[in-house]
């Protein structure tokens, strides 16, 4: 597990462009102005918008796979609970909005805003947020944005003792949130972070520390986390059109890829990379939201978001033993969903990339970056 965390941290550092924004500026970044999508982008770069009328249906289609049918969290890859009263009750609206819109780049949490290639329109995001707030049953009283004064050096020691086990030695995340992530630090105010440390989140592994740590100790942890900020700004990138599914098969005239399998369901990154190097025949499907494909993907991979269903792609896929390899960042939830759907359609050669795309990239295997450099900030 430690090796995996190191690889994820290395990938995050590699693909996150350091902004000129000073960490101090991040302290006051507590409101985000939602932007509306370009109709041209929405039509050409991803699937049609979700309906804005039914937040429950939006959640079930796009969120439940990882966050759980009842918002309980931890259904896949430690995705957090979305029904915690402390989260819904205290988080600024801009924090919730940005988390849905921009996700957490280089983690399993993708961007869902349509201007980034995601499936949700401006109105659909509002419907989802309104539904999450309503279902929580709590009265929202977002904490006031008051800067916290603390000692980052002293906070380092407190963090190492009480936080690193879940959140990672460098804040890269683990079973807990990636607290050093640029988007998190740019959108979570000092007061919100302090409130979360003190009060915890019911129904999650995040316990309250108000009775275990003094107020200065909590403030010092906040100062330590704030010192990790590198700056982040929202942007609206240029999106590339998805590739033609008629070209789904890579190296169509070559022999089928020879892959190392596990349990008849998973194939190793090492064997897939070797087959790519040998120029063998295969199909690669990116099961993440289109926004992640726009950011980076395995060379030649087709976007096949887990929430879209496989029916439209089926006519373009070979059913002659050619390996069809789906991947995601979870590393198995979204890709497994797609593979299960393909197997039901009779594609028995469908497999899951065992390590997922983040570990794939961390191991130095080929990655195609998106057309717009701002996507890699």
Predicted regions and their residues:
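Bacterial N-terminal signal peptides that target proteins for export
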Residues: 1-8
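Positively charged, proline/Ser/Thr-rich regional signature most characteristic
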Residues: 259-333
């Amino acid at each position: 597990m430690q090796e995996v965390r190191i690889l994820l941290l290395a990938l995050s550092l590699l693909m996150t462009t350091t902004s000129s924004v000073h960490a101090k500026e991040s302290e006051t970044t507590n409101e985000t102005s939602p932007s509306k999508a370009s109709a041209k982008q929405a039509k050409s770069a991803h699937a049609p918008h979700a309906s804005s009328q039914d937040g429950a249906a939006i959640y079930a289609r796009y969120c439940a796979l990882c966050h759980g049918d009842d918002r309980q969290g931890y259904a896949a890859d430690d995705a957090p609970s979305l029904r915690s009263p402390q989260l819904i009750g205290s988080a600024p609206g801009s924090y919730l909005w940005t988390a849905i819109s921009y996700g957490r780049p280089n983690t399993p949490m993708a961007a869902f805003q349509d201007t980034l290639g995601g499936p949700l329109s401006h109105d659909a995001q509002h419907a989802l947020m309104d539904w999450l707030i309503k279902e929580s049953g709590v009265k929202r009283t977002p904490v006031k944005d008051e800067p916290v004064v603390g000692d980052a050096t002293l906070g380092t020691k407190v963090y190492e003792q009480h936080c690193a086990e879940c959140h990672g030695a460098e804040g890269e995340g683990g079973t807990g949130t990636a607290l050093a992530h640029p988007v998190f630090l740019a959108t979570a105010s000092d007061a919100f972070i302090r409130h979360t440390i003190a009060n915890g989140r019911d129904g999650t592994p995040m316990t309250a520390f108000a009775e275990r740590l003094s107020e200065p100790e909590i403030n010092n942890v906040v100062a330590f986390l704030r010192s990790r900020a590198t700056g982040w700004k929202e942007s609206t990138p240029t999106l590339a059109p998805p590739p033609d599914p008629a070209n789904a098969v890579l190296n169509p005239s070559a022999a089928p890829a020879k892959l190392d399998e596990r349990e008849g369901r998973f194939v190793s990154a090492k064997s897939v990379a070797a087959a790519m190097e040998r120029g063998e025949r295969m199909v690669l499907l990116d099961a993440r939201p289109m926004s992640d494909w726009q950011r980076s993907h395995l060379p030649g991979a087709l976007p096949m978001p887990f929430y879209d269903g496989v029916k439209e792609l089926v006519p373009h896929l070979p059913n002659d033993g050619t390996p069809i390899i789906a991947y995601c960042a979870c590393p198995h939830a979204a890709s497994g969903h797609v593979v299960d759907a393909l197997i039901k359609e009779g594609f028995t050669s469908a497999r899951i990339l065992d390590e997922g795309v983040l570990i794939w990239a961390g191991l130095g295997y080929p990655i195609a970056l998106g057309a717009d450099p701002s996507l890699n900030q």
